[in-house]
Every structure is written in C-alpha cells, then in structure tokens.
C-alpha cells in the first residue's frame, strides 16, 4: 500500500492524479503538465507582462517533454475468474489486490520487488506476465496529474470566521443593501418539501471529515471508501497545511445538516453523504476506475471537482478502465437507471484553457458544470467549451463574495472557490429532483437540466437560440440551474425514449490545414434513417472524433455547424499549448444542438491561426474525422416542445403551482365576480315598449326594455353578466358558471373549475385545461397532492397505493414510501427485519449471510452492518481481523472495523502504533518497531535531542538512528 505522502510542493492546488501506459495497444495519452515552472506551473504575471512571457516560449519548445512516472501497480485482464487471476499473479511474482471495481475480468496486480516509482517502464522476468495465455491485456500504471478545481486565495480578499446561514447569499435574499440574487430557487424547492431524502451522494476527492458536526448526521459509511488507504474510513490526512480540505468543503455544500446550530445548510440537507478518498496519493487508471465503481446500486450521484491540469496545454482524459467504469455506471448503476456523474468544468480560464481538452467534462456520461459570479459575470477562472450543460454561482473577483461551507477540523469557511463549488451544488440540486422522482434515468436528468436551466442575468456575448428553441452559451451552457423548476418538472416527468447512437460520417481522406485560412469539410447524413435501432431524429450529444497532426497544437480552432445552423466551437486557441503531438482519436463533444433535427448537412471548420512566427512549410493535417450522433428516434417530450413547456412553467407563480395543503372550506375568500344585483325601474313609456316589441324567448314576465329584444328585465331561467358587462338571459349557464336557481343567476365557479355546483372551491365537478380534478376534495389543482398521482387521460388526481406516500403515473409506481415501507424498483415493500434483505426478484425478504447484521443481498460481501462479535474487513464481516490489522470502534457503527497496523508491525492491538510483533528487520521498542540498522553519525547531542523529544516513539525519526541512540542509553 503506498504511503500517504503529501504531493509535491508548488504554487498550485495539490495534484490530482494519473494516466497509464498500455502495453497491448502502445503508449497513449497526451503531453504532460511540466514546463519551465514544473508541474502545475501557472503564470501569474500582470497582464502587461504576458506578452514578454510569450516571447520566451520558443525557448521552451526545445525542452524535452516531462517523462511519465510508472508505479509498481498493474491493471491486468485475466480470463477464468478470481482464482485464475490469483494463480497467474503468483506464477509471475505479483500479488492480486482484487477485481477493479465492477469491471469483470480486470484485476489490480502489485509487485513488491520493482521500483515504486520510476521514469522507465519495468523490465525483468516478471514482465513475462504479458506472455501468459490467460492474460489478454495489461497496463503498468502511470501516475496521472489531477488537480482539485478550486482557485487560490486572493491576497486582497476578506475572510470571515462566522459562516452562517445569513452568509449564504446564493441561496437566499438577505442583503438589503445590494440587489438580491436567488435565481437558483433552492428555497422554493425546499418549500415544496424536497430536501434530498432517500438520495445518496458521494464526493470523489481527498476524503471527507465524517465526524464534522455538520456532516456527521447525514454521513453514510456505506457510500464511503478510502481507495488510497484501502480501508473504509474516508477521513482526510491531516497536516499543517490543511491541503486535504477540498472534499470536506464539497460535501458540506451538498448535505450539511440543517437546524443544528452549526455552520451552514446543505442544498440537500436530508440526503445521505459519503466520500471516496482517492486524490491523496498516486492516481492511476486503476484508482479512478475503482472510485467510479464503488457501490453503483447504492450511490445515486457521484460528484467530482477535479481533472487534468488546467494549465492551457494539457490534453488528457480517462483511461481505458475509467471509461469502462463510466459505461458500467450508466448502464447498470441505480438498478439500470444509470449512475449520475457531475463534474466541475475546470479553472484554466486565466491560462486560456478550453475544457474540451479535458476528457472528463467532455464526456456524454458526465454533467459538466460551469460557474458565474454573484453579479452574473464570467469568473476569471472559467473555461469555455461546448460540452458545458449548466451553471451555478461561485466566487469571482476579490471584491465579490465566495461560497460558505464546511471545513477541516470541524470548522467552517467562507472562502470556497472555483468550479469546485459548482459541481457539488448541482449534485445537491439533482438530489432534490431524485427525491421528487426516483425513477429518473441519467439521461432524464440531463434533459431536465437543459429544459429548466435559464440565462437569467448571466452576461455573455455568445448567447444564441439553437434550432430547437434552447438558449445556450459556451460560457454557461443552458444557463443557471433552477431547483424549483427542476423538481416541478421531475415530479411529472415521463422517461425519455431509448438512446440511439449513429455514426453519421467517417472521413479518412487526409487534408492539409492552410495557414490563416479555413479548412471546411462537410458530411450529408440521413442520421441512420435506414436502421431503426440506430436512427436519430432528435439530437442530444454530438461527438466529433478527430486525428490531427500539427507543429503547434495551440494554434488550432475547430467549429462544428449543424444542419439547423447552430455553430459550436469545439476548440479555441490555447497560447500556452506548444505541443507538436496534435490530436489522436480525440473526441470533442457539444450539447449546443440539443433537441435539433439530426438529418442534413454538417460542416466541420478548422482554422490554423499562428500566435507566433512559424515555418509556413510545416502545415497541419486533418488525418481523419468521424461524426457520432446521440439522441432519440421519437420526440423526447411527446406532445409538447421543451421550449414551450419551459416558458409556461416559468410563467406560473409559486402559489399557482403549489398543491393545496388541505381541503378548502366554503367560507374562504373567493375570486371576485363582475356581477351586480339588478332591479328593473319603471320608466315612462316602458309599458308601450313592452306592448309594441317582441322580447327574446328567455325574457321573463316583465318583458324587455330594448333597444334589443334580449335586453330583458328578468329571465325565465338564468341571467348572465351585469349592468357593466351587458346582461343577457340564457337557458343553461356556460362553462365556468353554475346556475343559482333561487336568484335565477349564473354565478362564476371558483378559479380552475370548468363546471361546479356552487361558488365554493370544494364544489368543482370538472376542471379547466391545465388543472386536475381532485375527486375526493372536489377541487381543481395544478399539481396533485402527496398520496395522489395525475391521471393524464382523465385529468383526475387518483389515489396512490396505500403503501405509497407519493407516486407517479400509476397507483403502485411509488417515488416515496410511507413509514414502515422501503422503495424497491418503484414499489413500496414492507421493511425487512434485521438480518434480512428485500429480494427484488422474488419480491420477499431473504436471509442475510450469517455474518451480517443488515445487508443488501445474500452474499458475504453484501453486508451493511456486521452481526454480533464480527468485524468489518475488506467488504466482509469476519470473526477476527487478519494479520497486520486490528479492530477499532467506529462512531455510528454497531460493529468494529479492521484497520491496518503501522507499516513495520506484523500485529498490533488497540491502535495502529501499538505494535505487538514486528516485521523482519525491525525490533520492538515499547509499542513501536524500529529498524535494526545502526548509524555512525549519531553523536551524543543528536541522540539527546531524539530521546528528549521522543522522536522515535512519535515515529518522526523511525529510520534515523533510533536503534543506535536508544541502545547507547
């Protein structure tokens, strides 16, 4: 197990993680993030000096690219199952550390006799592993650089140590001295009763402080794991710099507890929150794949605020295993509905970075989230690209407010910054939508964000309306997330049709890219109309896969124009990208064509705009490109357009959308009628008018007073209208009115009623368009209340199954269950007793494994809590911890968890440092194991300092003369 060593020092936030060298397919990946300033170098000179920096860049071109760093870990594909993988590993001197996440036949091998870190790939007899007939593929893991997407503190910024609810400006209007901004409408979603209940969110990061007072009430150990330390405690590694604060800050945004008199309120303050500790160590393809595959049928939302270097020159993305983990998650996660991956779009704006060079935010499987300042401006760190889906508020200039959240050491902070803020915000808002409708698929969630996000006051020069009526920008995607609109739409949402993929064009003809001019290549496509299982009519994601050679990659600009005329910028110039590697099968993705028709002519435009003098003979070349369309064959919203539905939804006031809380009494205030009592006044000559004119048949015995025959003085049946609106007599009252037989008047029904028996809100017989008839209360409502669902054919509110608290479409299609029941595949089933689990195939409670106290399945590795006298170890409940581990009590858990002893101990008791036996080469000294090596340069003064400060016992000098000093007395 690699030690928890701090990352290399540097001016940027801590590194994130790693790529790998594929020995089967050849070396892959783009250039590293080195350069004159070392890893993570970020030029921060004042703007007038930026051009001076550029003058120095040609010299940097001749510098060799940074070498990859290889580890002593391998990813290996072995056929035949776990036993065969163990055999193959042992035969070649490896240790099999187990299957990689949920990737069948892929295993994590470790070799203790090779260099832990090396700039050369490993050589020696152990490399014969690749020749084993059972090995189909292997990959020595290469350290990838991954950077947390927060921005560095501004020295001019002000900080406060009282981060409370009133400081959360982005959620409410509390500042009376400035213009109020609360367009994300989170409070309105809360008022509708949505707080994230029964939804599980986990943070992929450097760990979360599970005992923080604002996180502990919602902390979920079953949604947590320490991939770096290979145990179940995701707590961050503490040091003087507090560098591992990032995950704890993100977790607080999502699910900080409410009304506990501490710090803040999370957006989904009743959701469960977990943490995957995976950034505090070497991040490899194996580490990422493991992290993305932790409990996909338990965790609903994975939030990640990290990625490759945002340095304006890196092109990098997920490796082979991580890509497979993404695909497994969206196909199998959440019982087939699909795991939801939310990603921060990147902080490289100052370096001119473009987030389409980040393969994580550029993926169709992730929701890429951007940021805006409190005043609606582009933050200085924002990266533009066509794959951004939506936006939230975050930090901006030094004089603009930042985000309040939880912090390390049980504290709070008002200094959370960057797009790191935005991903967990959206994760929290999606949790509210999943509470409203737990049956949403991963694509439903993306459709909902497209449909309900809005430009609001976000300022950008590139806002455009695409061919489907959606307003979209490279800065902000479809706009600011609207939590209330999202939950209202989610509640009544019908799943979109199945996703189709169409490879619409594939052009392998090489073309030169002329300097300054534009290379245009077109593709006329039917969008696979001839194949029913591939046909795309309505677009979702559009991917352009390209291979381009070029002497200086950063000089390229790439655009894609859809048949509807929507122009997406797939790549902008990057002044710091001096690489001559070009692009190899790199996928650029755009969401700007969402909802448009796919069929027609697509145009790819490539421009080469040199930022410096370049040899004109060295031209770039488009080697090949493919157009891949994702979408549906049927309209995703059936009978209404997304744009119209969104516009209508935003026009409705909150009270109009709110379902009634209880039955209304007839005495309540009603809609005023434009009616007046009318008594006929006799006038001279009126009798003559009655005698000489023929009145309308509906006029009563008093006749009419003209000038027209229907100007009746009284009516046979009912009068309609008033003196002001010109009264008339009718035999039947029109829709929206009822007949008052005593007064012979047509009186207006209550708002929403089409027919009624009286003016009371509880006397509706049928409803106007846009309303549902609640038959039990005889009211007309825009949304059916809890316990009822909207029957679209009858336009009635019908009762849910008795076990359902909320349901959609059908009585038994539950979204929330009553107490004593649990949700399983849309049904509410009775809670199983301790020691049993719900079998969704047999629809009954089954017995857990005898080692489990509670479980999610019958297997030994499906325990949630252990039975009495059993300890949790390596996803299993065991009677005793294995060698090198000790049992430890964990707050909130009924069982003990096996924790690893100190690296020099063979066994320990009560604490990792309380050694009872030592490894070979070490001697026990009290409770510590010290090396048997002696040293000759330890004088009396040095040894006195070691002993007086108990440095050996504290393990600060465990390898430095401890034995020599202590044996010397």
From Swiss-Prot:
The PACE4A-I precursor protein seems to exist in the reticulum endoplasmic as both a monomer and a dimer-sized complex whereas mature PACE4A-I exists only as a monomer, suggesting that propeptide cleavage affects its tertiary or quaternary structure. Interacts (immature form including the propeptide) with RCN3; probably involved in the maturation and the secretion of PCSK6. It comes from the Eukaryota. Its EC number is 3.4.21.-. The propeptide domain acts as an intramolecular chaperone assisting the folding of the zymogen within the endoplasmic reticulum. Isoform PACE4D lacks the propeptide domain. This is Proprotein convertase subtilisin/kexin type 6. Residues 168-487 form the Peptidase S8 domain. Pfam families: GF_recep_IV, P_proprotein, Peptidase_S8, S8_pro-domain. Residues 64-149 form a propeptide. GO terms for biological process: determination of left/right symmetry; glycoprotein metabolic process; nerve growth factor production; peptide hormone processing; plasma lipoprotein particle remodeling; protein processing; regulation of BMP signaling pathway; secretion by cell.
